[in-house]
Amino acid sequence: MKFQALSPWGFAVIAIYLAGLALISIVSRRRAFIANDYLNATHSLPTWAAALSFLAYNCGSIEIIGMSAMASQYGVQALHFYWIGGIPGMVFFALVVLPLYIRSGARSLPEYLDRRFGPRVRLLNACISMVGTASLAGAALYAIAHVLHVVLGCNLLLGALASAMVVLAYVLLGGIRATIYTSIFQFFVVIAGLFPLLMATFPFRLTTFAQRPETWHLWQPLLLFAPHASLDRLGVVAGLGFVISFSYWCTDFVVVQRALTARGVEEARKVPILAGFGKLAIAFLIVLPGAAAPMLLHGAHAASHDETMPALLSLVYGPTLLGLGVAALLSGLMAGFAGNAAGFAAAWTQEIYRVRIRPDRPEQHYIRMGRWAVVMCFLLAGLAAYLAAQFRDLMEFLQLVLSLFYAPLLAAVLAGMFRKQARERDALAGILLGVMTGITLEACVRLGAIRFGSQMNANFYIAILSFSVSMLVASRVDSRTRQGSAAMVELPLEPMTVSSLRPTFTTGVLSVLLLAACLALNLVWW
C-alpha cells in the first residue's frame, strides 16, 4: 500500500467546506448587537445547538489527533479519556455545578467566583483561563500543521499560518455565534469524513487483536499502583477520572461558556448530558482506527504519533475521499482552535478589560477590543504550538496544562460550593500553591529527580498532588472564621441544598442512563 495524493475533486471538497464556513460566519455576524452577543451569547441558543457545539468543541484537536496518537501507543486504553475521563465529570457538571453557576446570575465562571469569593479570585481565574485557552489553541494549531504536512506536504510553519488565517477570519467576522454554528457544521463534517475509516480498518483491528491482545483491554493490563508503569489504575481513576476530568468539565472557560448559551437551567443541564451520549459513540470513531494503526502502517509514517490519523487517511482513502477526510480533520481542529480563541477574547474583554480597566464604555468598544484579543490569542497560540512540539505527543502536553492550571482551580470551586466558611484569601492561596506544586513536580520529572513510567502517568499524579494541596489550603478554617469574622465574604448566593439541585425527571433519567452506559462499556472492554 502507498500514500494517496489529493485529486482535483478532493480539493473541491475542501473548497466547499471553506465556503460553508464563510457563509455561516456572514449570517452569524448579523446577530451580534452587543458585547455579550459577540463574546458569550449567554442564554440565547436552543438546546440542540448548545449541545452540538458543546460536543463539537470537545471533539476537536484533543480527540482527533491526540486520541488517535494515544490509541496507536496504548490501544483501546485511550478510551479511558472518553469514558471515565469524560462521562462522570460531565454528569457532575450538569447536576451540581452548572445550576449553581446559572442561579448565581453569572455569565461566566470568573463572574461566579467574583460573587462567591471576590474580585481577586475573579482576576486570577480570568488569567488562568487565558493561559489555558491560548495553550489549547496552540495545541490545535500544532495539530493542524501536522495534518497539512502529512497530507499535502506543506511546511509546518506555512500550514499553521494558512489555517490560522482562515480561523481568524471567521472568528473576527462573527464572534462566538460564528464559532458555535461553524463548530456544529464542522462536527457533521468530522462524522462524514471519519466514518469510512472506521469501516475500512476493521480487518486490521482483528489482526491487531490476535497479535497484541493486551492492547484491547481497558483495565486488565493495569496494575493498581505503579507510577513506574505507563499507566496504572490509581492514576487513571483519581488523576484522570476525578481531578483532570472534573476540572476540565467544571472550570474550562469555553466548556462553561458553551453550556451557558442554553436558554434556561434545565436546558443547560441537558447540554453536557446529551453531549455525553455523543461522546460515548465518537470514542469508537477515533480510537479504534488508531488502535489498528501499528498493524496497518507498518512503521510507514513519521516517528511522531501525532501523525497517526492523517497518515491513516492518506493510506486508506482514495484521492477524492481523502478530500473529505482532510476536511474532517481540519473541521475538528479548527473548531477547537476557534472555540479557544473566542474564549480567550471573552476572558480578557469581559472579565479583565471591562471590569478592571475600562468599565462603562459603549458596547461597540468592547466588541472591537474582543477582536484585538482574538489576534493576541493567535500570537500566543504560536508560542504554545512550539511548546507542544517539545512533547512526544499532543495529549501529554494537553493533560499537563490541565494538571497544572485547572486542577487547583477545581479545588477552589469545590471549596466554595461545599464550605460556607471558604474565604477569598484562602482560595487565592490555594490556587497559587496548587499551581506552584504542579510546576515544581513537573520540573523534578524533567530533571530526572522523580521518575514515572510515562509523561502521561506523571501528569495524572501531578494533578492529584496539585489538587490536594490546593484543596487543603482553600478549605481550611481558622479560629477567626469559626467566630464569623468580618474577613469572610458575604455570600450573595443561596446555600447549596439537595432540593435546589434536584433535576427534572427527564434530566435525571438521562443522567442515570448515561452513567449506566459508561459503566457497561467499561465492563465489556475490561
Which residue stretches match the model-derived regions?
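Membrane-embedded helix-loop-helix hairpins and adjacent transmembrane boundary segments
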Residues: M1-W526
